[in-house]
Structure formats: structure tokens, C-alpha cells
Swiss-Prot record:
Pfam families: AP_endonuc_2 (PF01261). NCBIfam families: hxl6Piso_put, PRK13209.1, PRK13210.1. It comes from Escherichia coli (strain ATCC 8739 / DSM 1576 / NBRC 3972 / NCIMB 8545 / WDCM 00012 / Crooks). Its EC number is 5.1.3.22. Keywords: Isomerase. Gene3D superfamilies: Divalent-metal-dependent TIM barrel enzymes (3.20.20.150). The lineage of its organism: Bacteria, Pseudomonadati, Pseudomonadota, Gammaproteobacteria, Enterobacterales. This is L-ribulose-5-phosphate 3-epimerase UlaE.
Length: 284
């Protein structure tokens, strides 16, 4: 029987680095998480996962079955390095090939949602042509995802092109495809001049998962929970009242910390306390 509890997950980069997924999922289970989100970033090490052998993919599936901890989503940030909006045709082609491989990987191992980074370009100057290429790249990507029955979900970013749910909804309407949805980050959403609660309400019906982190104006990573500007309790209340019942993912980058598990446990308790105040989970 499926649990009625709120699914709470942890980002791979919060846990100790390494390629043993059985150990990673066992630790996540010990820490009380329902799932882990995989990272495929712009490093060669994590990009190489998209070329895993059949045996390596099967090892991940077996680890999921053995531990009962799911890997339902992938954070695909590799497009920073190989952006879909690049004016260099070779770079853009690599970006589309990464997308194809990521969708195939997701299909093979049971990942349901690939979170996309909302950058037309990252290391170059954006213009109308990069945005056009980005839109066309998304269209091609969503066609691939549709055939594979894998959802592509746009993150609300630390970048003006995609820094609000309203802007991401524009792409959802343009693509008009059920396999393209939204994956807001309440930290990123709060760091800009957005009406956060109105934005969350506007996205209901399109939100497939929520990233949970704290931020400050202009600071989008490594802000300790409680030291930033995010009104977590209000965000959780708004999402609950609007009918959102999906997963929440604590996003952290503590893999190189002295004791990553302790950092994660502290963050988990802090977030769950705010969820309890919002009436989402029972108080500990």
C-alpha cells in the first residue's frame, strides 16, 4: 500500500561522494529519506554515467530494490557546459545528445523526472538567437521525452530567463506537452523580486516536485537553513492549500563536508519542523 506521507528526498551532492549507489541509498535510508535525486552535472565524472554499461545500470536498479529507497529524479545540470541555446552548432549538438542519453538512461533505470536547467547559455552572452535555439532545443527534447514517457521539468533558476514560475509557464504553454512540467526551487524563487506565494499558486497543476533550500539576494547556494530569506512555513502552507501532494527534495552541497551525514540530519530536522508547523507532517 502506498504511503500517504509527504515524500521527502535528499540531493546526491548532500551525501558523501563516490559511485557506490548501494552505500548511498543505505545511508539515505538510515537518515530517514524516501528517495535520492541523482546529479548529472557538467563534470566528466558525472557525465560518464550516461554511458554506463547494462551491468552498471542494473546495479543501480538492484540497489533501489534492495534498500527500498527510490531514485525517481535526475538533476541534469550538464547543459551549463553544453547549452541548448549555444550558437556553436557542435556544442548545441552535444547538448542534444546529452539529453537523448539522459532520457534513455532514465528509461532504463526507472527515473521518472529529469530536472532541466533553465539556461539558454551559461558561460556566453545571451541574445535573441540563443533564446530561439533554446526554445527549439526544448521542443526537440520534449519530443524525445514523450516517446520514452519521461517527464522533463524546468527548474526555477538563479538566472533571469527562468527566475519565476510565470516565465516557466510561458515555456509550458509554448510546448503544450504533458511531458514538460515545472520543478520549482523555493530558494531560487524567493531570492528574486517575486510574489512567492502567488507564483506557487500559479504553478499548481504543473509542479511535479519542489526543491527546498535557503537563499539570500544574489546568493543561491550553501546558505544554511534559517539564515536566508525563504519563508518556508508559508511556502509549505501555500503548496498544501493549493493541493500539491508531490515530493520535496532537500538540496544541499555537503558531500565534501567533514561529516556530510550530520549536516544532512540537521537540515532534515530543521525542514521537517517547518513542515510540521505548516501542518504537512506530524511534529517530532
Amino acid at each position: 500500500m502506498l504511503s500517504k506521507q509527504i515524500p521527502l528526498g535528499i540531493y546526491e551532492k548532500a551525501l558523501p561522494a563516490g559511485e557506490c549507489w548501494l552505500e548511498r541509498l543505505q545511508l539515505a535510508k538510515t537518515l530517514g529519506f524516501d528517495f535520492v535525486e541523482m546529479s548529472v552535472d557538467e563534470t566528466d565524472e558525472r557525465l560518464s554515467r550516461l554511458d554506463w554499461s547494462r551491468e552498471q545500470r542494473l546495479a543501480l536498479v538492484n540497489a533501489i530494490v534492495e534498500t527500498g529507497v527510490r531514485v525517481p529524479s535526475m538533476c541534469l545540470s550538464a547543459h551549463r557546459r553544453f547549452p541548448l541555446g549555444s550558437e556553436d552548432d557542435a556544442v548545441r549538438a552535444q547538448g542534444l545528445e546529452i539529453m537523448r542519453k539522459a532520457i534513455q538512461f532514465a528509461q532504463d533505470v526507472g527515473i521518472r523526472v529529469i530536472q532541466l536547467a533553465g539556461y539558454d547559455v551559461y558561460y556566453q552572452e545571451a541574445n535573441n538567437e540563443t533564446r530561439r535555439r533554446f526554445r527549439d532545443g526544448l521542443k526537440e527534447s520534449v519530443e524525445m521525452a514523450s516517446r520514452a514517457q519521461v517527464t522533463l521539468a524546468m527548474e526555477i533558476m538563479d538566472y533571469p530567463l527562468m527566475n519565476s514560475i510565470s516565465k516557466a509557464l510561458g515555456y509550458a504553454h509554448y510546448l503544450n506537452n504533458p511531458w514538460f512540467q515545472l520543478y520549482p526551487d523555493i530558494g531560487n524563487l524567493s531570492a528574486w523580486d517575486n510574489d512567492v506565494q502567488m507564483e506557487l499558486q500559479a504553478g499548481i497543476g504543473h509542479i511535479v516536485a519542489v526543491h527546498v533550500k535557503d537563499t539570500k539576494s544574489g546568493v543561491f547556494k550553501n546558505v544554511p537553513f534559517g539564515e536566508g530569506v525563504v519563508d518556508f512555513e508559508r511556502c509549505f502552507e501555500t503548496l498544501k492549500q493549493s493541493g500539491y501532494c508531490g515530493p520535496y527534495l532537500i538540496e544541499m552541497w555537503s558531500e565534501t563536508a567533514e561529516d556530510p551525514a550530520a549536516e544532512v540530519a540537521k537540515a532534515r530536522d530543521w525542514v521537517k519542523a517547518r513542515m510540521a508547523k505548516a501542518g504537512m507532517v506530524e511534529a517530532a
